[in-house]
Amino acid sequence: ESECPWHPWC
């Protein structure tokens, strides 16, 4: 995903 500031599996 592009929005990855909120999930730690990025």
From Swiss-Prot:
It comes from the Eukaryota. The modification Cysteine amide is found at C10. One of its GO terms (cellular component) is extracellular region. Its main location: secreted. GO terms for molecular function: ion channel regulator activity; toxin activity. The modification 4-carboxyglutamate is found at E3. Its target is unknown, but this toxin may modulate voltage-activated calcium channels (Cav) or calcium-dependent potassium channels (KCa). This is Contryphan-Ar4. It comes from Conus araneosus.
